[in-house]
């Protein structure tokens, strides 16, 4: 256990997260929970969904106390619709289940709550447990992530949720965001909230200890494991979602001449869930893009380590769906370049994972990566609309840089991550913020009840009207 707090200062911190799957938000939650636990605090994570086959190792191997609640009445969606409404109702169900329907939360006697991604339940949580302060981590305003606002009834349907998001966030005792970029977006989106609250910046982090022995020589341990290491691996790790713009990596790689590519391989790995239609359809679109005109690249898709290792040597683009941590680790250690394609990414944890393992990063010159990747030192920042510039960097890494030059760049990446984004630093920062939060007053419950009741009635009226229109 890492050096932590004195016995008298140990707290019980309860996390609330909607769906503990595999993604950047979930990685942050797991890292925050493990970090606080390593400092001596008791940590319990409540979530409405956690599939042992599709979650991070710490959530399934006993490292963390993960409890699934609030999932027995409301489904994640209704015929593919109303996902935000269902998510809110599932969160409210979870809160009611652990507070009123059982004594589970009372038994834990939480010192503080860590809530992220969904703020809708904060008023109810504050009402039922007014003495425990709430820390809310805003990854990005949800209202800016929603697609398909073209129709008037969809805009009307979203209006109460968008309003509720800002209003409910005001019930948090402290609010943090994941980057200065996100802080600017939040301040612009909700100027009233930003004027009343000081938004903390708490960068996501990674565990720097598990790679400390081998980060300086990232390829040495894995040359005999992956058959493609010597030919050059360009790696992309992202969820199979269109907003991640994975197509950019394929277009840039395909822009290289056969001589420039040589026997190099573009490996596209990432989160993939058969339940999510976009994951399935986007993977198919990417395969069609790579194989079709004008690129005509040879592709293969693998879902297991064995099938990945058995792919034909002449495969140019390899898709790996929902890679386990062990294979992801090997890929990161074996890659020559990590390409991170999303534009205006809120933060982006994958570039840190690559830099920690001595791998240079090519990322978009906007959003979170501008706070992590140092141009020309730990990687490159390029315009995501200029495929040619991305191709030039790929060519430079594959053909224009020697091993020593790549190692020097990799070493600077390791130093930057360990100096700025270590997991111990995030845990200490969270601990400091939680310690500063004032304890609530049970006498506030009556006023909160009146406010919450009026708000619920108003929202229910709007949703009901739109519900009948949509159906």
From Swiss-Prot:
Keywords: Endoplasmic reticulum, Glycoprotein, Glycosyltransferase, Membrane, Transferase, Transmembrane, Transmembrane helix. It comes from the Eukaryota. It catalyses: a beta-D-Man-(1->4)-beta-D-GlcNAc-(1->4)-alpha-D-GlcNAc-diphospho-di-trans,poly-cis-dolichol + GDP-alpha-D-mannose = an alpha-D-Man-(1->3)-beta-D-Man-(1->4)-beta-D-GlcNAc-(1->4)-alpha-D-GlcNAc-diphospho-di-trans,poly-cis-dolichol + GDP + H(+); an alpha-D-Man-(1->3)-beta-D-Man-(1->4)-beta-D-GlcNAc-(1->4)-alpha-D-GlcNAc-diphospho-di-trans,poly-cis-dolichol + GDP-alpha-D-mannose = an alpha-D-Man-(1->3)-[alpha-D-Man-(1->6)]-beta-D-Man-(1->4)-beta-D-GlcNAc-(1->4)-alpha-D-GlcNAc-diphospho-di-trans,poly-cis-dolichol + GDP + H(+). It is an enzyme of class 2 (transferase). Its EC number is 2.4.1.132, 2.4.1.257. Pathway: Protein modification; protein glycosylation. This is Alpha-1,3/1,6-mannosyltransferase alg-2. Belongs to the glycosyltransferase group 1 family. Glycosyltransferase 4 subfamily. It is a single-pass membrane protein. GO terms for cellular component: endomembrane system; endoplasmic reticulum membrane. The lineage of its organism: Eukaryota, Fungi, Dikarya, Ascomycota, Pezizomycotina. One of its GO terms (biological process) is dolichol-linked oligosaccharide biosynthetic process. GO terms for molecular function: alpha-1,3-mannosyltransferase activity; GDP-Man:Man1GlcNAc2-PP-Dol alpha-1,3-mannosyltransferase activity; GDP-Man:Man2GlcNAc2-PP-dolichol alpha-1,6-mannosyltransferase activity. Mannosylates Man(2)GlcNAc(2)-dolichol diphosphate and Man(1)GlcNAc(2)-dolichol diphosphate to form Man(3)GlcNAc(2)-dolichol diphosphate. SUPFAM superfamilies: UDP-Glycosyltransferase/glycogen phosphorylase (SSF53756). The keyword Lipid metabolism does not apply. The gene is alg-2. The keyword Translocase does not apply.
């Amino acid at each position: 256990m890492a050096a932590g707090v004195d016995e008298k200062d140990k707290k019980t911190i309860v996390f609330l997260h909607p769906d503990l799957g595999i993604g950047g938000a979930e990685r942050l939650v797991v890292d925050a929970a493990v970090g606080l636990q390593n400092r001596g605090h008791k940590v319990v994570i409540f979530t409405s969904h956690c599939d042992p086959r599709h979650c991070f190792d710490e959530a399934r191997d006993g490292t963390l106390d993960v409890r699934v609640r609030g999932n027995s009445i409301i489904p994640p969606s209704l015929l593919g619709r109303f996902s935000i409404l269902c998510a809110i109702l599932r969160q409210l169900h979870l809160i009611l289940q652990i507070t009123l329907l059982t004594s589970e939360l009372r038994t834990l006697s939480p010192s503080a709550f860590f809530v992220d991604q969904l703020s809708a339940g904060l008023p109810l949580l504050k009402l039922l447990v007014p003495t425990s302060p709430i820390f809310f981590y805003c990854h990005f305003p949800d209202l800016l992530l929603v697609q398909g606002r073209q129709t008037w009834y969809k805009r009307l349907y979203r209006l109460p949720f968008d309003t509720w998001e800002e209003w409910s966030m005001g019930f948090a005792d402290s609010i943090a965001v994941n980057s200065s970029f996100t802080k600017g977006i939040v301040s612009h989106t909700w100027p009233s909230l930003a004027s009343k609250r000081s938004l903390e910046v708490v960068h996501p982090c990674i565990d720097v200890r598990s790679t400390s022995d081998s980060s300086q020589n990232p390829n040495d341990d894995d040359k005999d494991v992956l058959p493609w290491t010597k030919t050059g691996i360009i790696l992309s790790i992202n969820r199979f979602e269109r907003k991640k713009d994975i197509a950019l990596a394929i277009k840039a790689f395909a822009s290289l001449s056969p001589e420039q590519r040589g026997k190099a391989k573009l490996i596209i790995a990432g989160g993939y869930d058969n339940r999510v239609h976009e994951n399935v359809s986007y993977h198919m679109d990417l395969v069609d893009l790579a194989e079709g005109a004008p690129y005509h690249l040879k592709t293969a898709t693998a879902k297991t380590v064995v099938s990945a290792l058995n792919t034909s040597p002449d495969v140019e683009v390899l898709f790996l769906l929902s890679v386990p941590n062990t294979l992801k680790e090997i890929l990161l250690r074996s890659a020559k370049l990590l390409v991170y394609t999303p534009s205006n990414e809120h933060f982006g944890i994958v570039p840190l994972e690559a830099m920690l393992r001595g791998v240079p990063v090519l990322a978009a010159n906007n959003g979170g990566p501008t706070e992590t990747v140092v141009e020309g030192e730990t990687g490159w920042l390029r315009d995501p609309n200029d495929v040619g510039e991305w191709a030039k960097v790929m060519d430079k890494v594959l053909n224009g840089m020697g091993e020593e030059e790549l190692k020097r760049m990799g070493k600077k990446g390791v130093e930057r991550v360990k100096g700025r984004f270590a997991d111990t630093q995030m845990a200490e920062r969270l601990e400091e913020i939680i310690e500063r939060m004032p304890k609530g007053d049970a006498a506030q419950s009556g006023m909160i009840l009146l406010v919450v009741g009026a708000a619920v009635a108003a929202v229910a009226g709007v949703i009901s009207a739109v519900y009948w229109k949509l159906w």
